[in-house]
Design a protein with these regions (language model features):
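Multi-pass alpha-helical transmembrane bundle typical of ion/small-solute transporters
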Residues: 1-218
């Protein structure tokens, strides 16, 4: 049974709206590390400026894309529910707190050119912080789904359920994937810099047949 009273209706709508607002703010703040780029007259071209800050720029676009996919997954999961109980609330709050912290981890990771494209070099732990945050976001989504499946009264009665290896292990695979990149970054930033490429291919393996949504990460 669900833990505590199930809050539905307007209370549930407000939780979803609150979550969407925090994601919108966090994903906008991601651009701040590169918002102040400028060209000193006679000193550099626009391409040189972009090249000098390629780490921050690549990190911004990748993180923007990943957060968008994570929000899409979160939105799909929450839309399948009719309300929330205590565990759902706190897991969602944890999810939001890490989303809100991502601009910090993204800025630290982007400052190091070692993070992307086989650049090599020392990440100083910023890779572990960045990818560990991604893993925690996926973990919270996975735990929300796991709790809801154990408490079917949280679901809308007309929602279809899928019981395949993809639905059981997809979330854990993403958690392991993100965490693995972080661990590898501690020892070999060059190897870990190619890890993000997997994010574009994992959905081809892990999405349910017939699913039209790309990059589900629950």
């Amino acid at each position: 049974m669900a833990t505590g009273e199930i809050k539905d209706g307007r209370s549930f709508d407000r939780l979803i709206n609150f979550s969407d607002a925090i994601v919108a703010v966090a994903i906008t703040v991601l651009v701040l590390p590169i918002a102040g780029l400028s060209i000193e007259r006679g000193e550099a071209t626009v391409w040189e400026v972009l090249g000098d800050h390629r780490g921050e720029i690549i990190t911004f676009f990748f993180t923007f894309f990943v957060v968008s996919v994570m929000w899409l997954t979160h939105n799909r999961v929450m839309n399948e529910l009719r309300g929330y109980d205590g565990p759902i609330f706190w897991l969602n709050t944890s999810w939001l707190s890490i989303i809100a912290f991502l601009p910090v981890t993204s800025a630290l990771y982007g400052d190091s050119e070692a993070g992307w494209a086989g650049a090599g070099g020392d990440l100083g732990g910023s890779g572990m912080l960045y990818w560990g945050s991604m893993a925690l976001i996926s973990l919270n989504t996975t735990l929300i789904v796991r709790h809801a499946r154990k408490n079917p009264e949280l679901y809308e009665s007309e929602q279809p359920t899928y019981d395949t290896w993809r639905t059981k292990y997809r979330g854990w695979i993403y958690v392991t994937y993100f965490l693995s990149i972080g661990v590898v970054s501690l020892f070999s930033p060059t190897i870990s810099s190619y890890g993000p490429l997997g994010f574009f291919f994992l959905p081809l393996l892990l999405n349910n047949p017939g699913s039209s949504t790309t990059g589900k990460t629950n």
